[in-house]
Amino acid sequence: MVTYSESGVDIDLEAVTVSKLASKLKSTLEYRDIITDSGHYAALVRLGDKAIAMSTDGVGSKILIAEMMNKYDTVGIDCIAMVVNDILCVGAEPIALVDYLAVEQPDPERAEEIAEGLVTGAKESRISIIGGETASLPGIIKDFDLAGTGIGFVDVDKIITGEDIEAGDVLIGIESNGIHSNGYSLARKALFDDAGFSIDDKMPNCDTTIGEELIRPTELYVKPIVALFKEEYDIHGLAHITGGGFTNLRRLKKGVGYDIYDLPEAPEIFKLIYQQNVPLEEMYKVFNMGIGFVVITNENEAEKIMETLKDYCNCQIIGKVTDDEKITVKTFEGSEVTY
């Protein structure tokens, strides 16, 4: 049985670490009018009748896949996506980003490829990359790491934190295009270390290789979600489904649960990972399993929201909000997992 912790990532220890950091940093919040808790997707700072949304994230160990394939022109898209998709989750439209590239040794050609992806992601998201930092850190960094910090703006009266979520609301799931940028330590262990696949091996039931599926850039959700903002729908919550899978929904509101009973067919890459002795409970806790973003709204508003979304992406109602605080997911095998 292969788990995330066995692949070198201890989610529970990460949570304790983040908690200790946050408890110390909390003392600085008194200097500004902060709206969101530190555990939300993006922080909000009030400026009069508007708020700045800020979020920071990186590409993670997906970079190792880029190195295996000697292909660096898409990891910049991942960097942009991981930041802007989080900013959307508080109702804000992303507007700008700064990047951080840490390298073992400078490599101008690789940096140019990385920049191509950053530009592609920025143009698709309609944001400006206004600066950044490149640091040479031999002895600290192996190869390179890439991260970004983004900002967005939102009117204070249009902020979406999840506080309006209530039992009976419906979950609209927007499809992912694969793994996106989370769970790669588990994927690499299951597929390469344990099963012995290579990046050039063909995917079952697909015309692509395993490497091509793993390097596929993270979906950008700016256009469809901003389209919802402009229509001023009654949106109760927004969730970017990243590391932690559907347990990310707990970041929105305490005291509610979620019954996820109608997911689209899981992409083949997830089925291949599962076949390498990874438990279903672990799969749905680590990966997005085919849903990259969730919109939570009341039942009456759902159809109108989906009509707008379908101009940009594939979506469907995947579940509902409950009042028992559990998250239950019906898996592609027909069984249920509960968190």
Curated annotation (Swiss-Prot):
Covalent S-S links between cysteines: none
Locations listed in the record: Cytoplasm
Keyword Nucleotidyltransferase assigned: no
Gene3D superfamilies reported for this sequence: PurM-like C-terminal domain, PurM-like, N-terminal domain
Molecular functions per Gene Ontology: ATP binding; phosphoribosylamine-glycine ligase activity; phosphoribosylformylglycinamidine cyclo-ligase activity
This protein's UniProt keywords: ATP-binding, Cytoplasm, Ligase, Nucleotide-binding, Purine biosynthesis
Reaction it catalyzes: 2-formamido-N(1)-(5-O-phospho-beta-D-ribosyl)acetamidine + ATP = 5-amino-1-(5-phospho-beta-D-ribosyl)imidazole + ADP + phosphate + H(+)
Pathway this chain belongs to: Purine metabolism; IMP biosynthesis via de novo pathway; 5-amino-1-(5-phospho-D-ribosyl)imidazole from N(2)-formyl-N(1)-(5-phospho-D-ribosyl)glycinamide: step 2/2
GO biological process, one term: 'de novo' IMP biosynthetic process
Entry superkingdom: Archaea
Enzyme Commission number(s) from the entry: 6.3.3.1
Gene Ontology CC entries for this record: cytosol
Pfam annotation, one family: AIRS_C
Family listed: Belongs to the AIR synthase family.
PANTHER family named among the record's database cross-references: TRIFUNCTIONAL PURINE BIOSYNTHETIC PROTEIN ADENOSINE-3 (PTHR10520:SF12), TRIFUNCTIONAL PURINE BIOSYNTHETIC PROTEIN ADENOSINE-3-RELATED (PTHR10520)
HAMAP family cross-referenced by the UniProt entry: AIRS
Protein name per Swiss-Prot or TrEMBL: Phosphoribosylformylglycinamidine cyclo-ligase
Taxonomy of the source species: Archaea, Methanobacteriati, Methanobacteriota, Methanomada group, Methanobacteria
